[in-house]
Amino acid sequence: MIKSFKHKGLKLLFEKGVTSGVPAQDVDRINDRLQAIDTATEIGELNRQIYKLHPLKGDREGYWSITVRANWRITFQFINGDAYILNYEDYH
């Protein structure tokens, strides 16, 4: 279950369906990924080829990343079946 957001646009999309805070061409993909994250009870459930799930390293250790489009990712921490600090970013 999603517990917290860093990115205000993701939060508005997830909680209220407001699309103005994310790129219009990515709304469907972002919604798909948010729903998958929200229903996942373990990180392995997000290990779909299309998501390219992977753990981050270095100063981002403890965070996971899934692909939305090109370099854009949803990053988050996954602790005891819950997702925290969801962000939409290009960290490359």
From Swiss-Prot:
<dbReference type="GO" id="GO:0004521">
    <property type="term" value="F:RNA endonuclease activity"/>
</dbReference>
<dbReference type="Pfam" id="PF05015">
    <property type="entry name" value="HigB-like_toxin"/>
</dbReference>
<dbReference type="GO" id="GO:0030371">
    <property type="term" value="F:translation repressor activity"/>
</dbReference>
<keyword id="KW-0540">Nuclease</keyword>
<dbReference type="GO" id="GO:0043022">
    <property type="term" value="F:ribosome binding"/>
</dbReference>
<dbReference type="GO" id="GO:0008285">
    <property type="term" value="P:negative regulation of cell population proliferation"/>
</dbReference>
<dbReference type="GO" id="GO:0017148">
    <property type="term" value="P:negative regulation of translation"/>
</dbReference>
<dbReference type="GO" id="GO:0006276">
    <property type="term" value="P:plasmid maintenance"/>
</dbReference>
<dbReference type="GO" id="GO:0030308">
    <property type="term" value="P:negative regulation of cell growth"/>
</dbReference>
<dbReference type="GO" id="GO:0006401">
    <property type="term" value="P:RNA catabolic process"/>
</dbReference>
<keyword id="KW-0378">Hydrolase</keyword>
<feature type="active site">
    <location>
        <position position="92"/>
    </location>
</feature>
<comment type="function">
    <text>Toxic component of a type II toxin-antitoxin (TA) system. A ribosome-associated translation-dependent mRNA interferase. Inhibits translation by sequence-specific cleavage of mRNA. Prefers either in-frame or out-of-frame 5'-AAA-3' codons (lysine). Also cleaves the first three AAAs of stretches of four or more A sequences. 20% of codons containing AA are cleaved and occassionally cuts even at a single A.</text>
</comment>
<keyword id="KW-0694">RNA-binding</keyword>
<protein>
    <recommendedName>
        <fullName>Endoribonuclease HigB</fullName>
        <ecNumber>3.1.-.-</ecNumber>
    </recommendedName>
</protein>
<keyword id="KW-0614">Plasmid</keyword>
<keyword id="KW-0255">Endonuclease</keyword>
<dbReference type="InterPro" id="IPR035093">
    <property type="entry name" value="RelE/ParE_toxin_dom_sf"/>
</dbReference>
<comment type="subunit">
    <text>Forms a complex with the antitoxin HigA which inhibits the mRNA interferase activity. The heterodimer dimerizes to form a HigB-(HigA)2-HigB tetramer that is able to bind to the DNA.</text>
</comment>
<dbReference type="InterPro" id="IPR007711">
    <property type="entry name" value="HigB-1"/>
</dbReference>
<dbReference type="GO" id="GO:0003729">
    <property type="term" value="F:mRNA binding"/>
</dbReference>
<keyword id="KW-1277">Toxin-antitoxin system</keyword>
<feature type="site" description="Interaction with HigA">
    <location>
        <position position="31"/>
    </location>
</feature>
<feature type="site" description="Interaction with HigA">
    <location>
        <position position="14"/>
    </location>
</feature>
